[in-house]
């Protein structure tokens, strides 16, 4: 078999025409490695080698495009390639090559991920650490890089979230409001000792003004359907759910 023509395609590929009417789609890397010039003779053994190396290039460039679209951990990238049903040996080879070239690096990934989460979310350190662990980042790397999220920054973030919680839940009583904010911060991944040290700076006393306003609002809502002791019972239940208590003068 002899090469009679080339046609440049997209994404670094070429269509190679042979004199037996066969056409090959090969990466430029393959053409350069095997010095595939016009009129070059190809035997079946070489054809097998070309196909194997072309597959290798395909896995590598698919992996490279994947991390160019979004930086990934080694585990994430490997799972991505396995889902595409590439042979495991070629996947491992591509990943090793990317590691050697510096395109893959779990420490750099962890650092970038943590910075991004700090800037774009309200997540606490434990939640971020859990997400990195799910991406199979080494625990030593996680523990070292999470130091980027300083206690000072966490404290300021907790204060911001407490203020927001107070503002958006202004119709709740002090005890219920404090517990809700505490639970929200814990779920967000903040350290409970740090939460307690910050939250104790705030006053969460029951506010009689809030209770009165809520009572009047509930009265207007339910007095159209209930009256007397039944109406009072329903209003008291609703107030209790909000951590409020109000006795009419």
Regions found by a protein language model. Give the residues of each.
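An alpha-helical, amphipathic repeat domain used for nucleic-acid recognition
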Residues: 1-249
């Amino acid at each position: 078999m002899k090469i009679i023509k080339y046609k440049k395609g997209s994404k670094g590929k070429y269509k190679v025409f042979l004199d037996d009417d066969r056409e090959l789609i090969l990466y430029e890397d393959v053409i350069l490695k095997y010095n595939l010039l016009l009129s070059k003779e190809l035997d079946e053994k070489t054809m097998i080698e070309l196909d194997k190396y072309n597959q290798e290039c395909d896995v590598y460039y698919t992996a490279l495009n994947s991390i160019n679209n979004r930086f990934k951990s080694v585990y994430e990238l490997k799972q991505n390639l396995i889902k595409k049903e590439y042979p495991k040996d070629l996947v491992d080879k591509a990943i090793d090559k990317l590691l050697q070239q510096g395109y893959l690096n779990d420490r750099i990934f962890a650092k970038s991920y943590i910075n991004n989460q700090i800037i774009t979310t309200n997540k606490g350190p434990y939640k971020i650490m859990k997400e990195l662990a799910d991406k199979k980042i080494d625990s030593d790397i996680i523990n070292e890089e999470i130091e980027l999220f300083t206690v000072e920054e966490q404290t300021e973030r907790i204060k911001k979230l407490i203020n927001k919680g107070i503002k958006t839940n202004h119709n709740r009583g002090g005890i219920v409001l404090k517990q809700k904010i505490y639970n929200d911060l814990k779920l967000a991944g903040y350290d409970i000792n740090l939460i307690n040290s910050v939250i104790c700076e705030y006053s969460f006393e029951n506010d009689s003004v809030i209770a009165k306003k809520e009572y009047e609002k509930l009265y207007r809502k339910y007095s159209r359907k209930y009256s007397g002791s039944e109406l009072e019972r329903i209003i008291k239940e609703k107030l209790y759910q909000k951590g409020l208590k109000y006795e009419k003068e």
